[in-house]
Amino acid sequence: MANLPSSAAAVGQAAPDFRLHSTPDQKLALSELRGRPVVLVFYPADWSPVCGDQVSLYNELLSEFRAYSAEILGISVDGVWCHSAFASDRKLHFPLLADFEPKGDVARRYGVYEESDGVAQRALFVIDADGIVRWRYVSPIGINPGADGILDALEKLPQGNRT
């Protein structure tokens, strides 16, 4: 497990709120999802092989996440039109949010922006129904972190029993 910088959203602390484009004409705020767990999936870029495999895996496991009433949100610095084409190509059924302008602002607030490459690190956060970070993980850039850690974290939430 890679270490997160001390500036990262810490386990036990409130998750930084944000409002990002989910479509060209709609924005989604993290605070709008209070009352249910949220999985934030920061990833470097649409169309890269590892990122494509990672989000496709989560798409296949949506019923597992939803068994915990969890919402999953993908976040990268790509623009909304790029996300739209990528989601359509991969047949994704969860929002991809554009951390595009200002570039990487949300990734920076979570402590997972890679300045040298101008992309988000491959990072996962599980946020509980009250908006508190309960688990976080940064994977090496070329490694798909899979879903086991996410599912374990969801299981450990106070109301982590499956519905």
Residue ranges and their predicted role:
Residues M1-T163:
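Chalcogenol-based redox active-site neighborhoods
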